[in-house]
């Protein structure tokens, strides 16, 4: 936590009985009954401008009557399985930055630097953060135009970390962090297009591997443009 108590100490994260779980497996909001401690508006924004981003300040100027930021009590609700916590302990004494900070060596599972010493280590903690092992999700994307119009694009995303594969062997080094697949399901002019990515740990040794399947052409091509700040699929360059 911090000195004034506005950020509490971490006590292990959200308990398994923190709220009810519905038939689809979703946890109910355990903080649903909480009320904001205060609300930032265009009238009092100057009191908090040192804690707001330029984008937030711009929103208050553009929409002074409607844009508000309710501020709630801070909760340290994040938690990970015990095996991930143990891996982080091992990483603390074994993992090293290589290739000028562009890769990792002797890394296992997640959180290579539990006690980060510089910005690069913080970035790698974010890149390798635990995200549940494997995930399948449905995504709806809207890219608004200046006039307010938009076209919805629907995706099926799936990704899995190498450590979640059945044949994973921690004693067998691999340069792959996770595998990602994205399939467009609508609109019809884009439906069937597929993106496949092998995300690598050391991208100097082996750059990210990506392929695109174009349903209209029925061809698979390598996709080196899927890197760094390359635009997201069907986002008109806005994401």
Regions of interest found by a model, annotated:
Residues 1-207:
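Solvent-exposed N-terminal domain segments of exported/luminal and surface proteins
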Residues 194-239:
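Acidic, serine/threonine- and glycine-rich low-complexity intrinsically disordered segments
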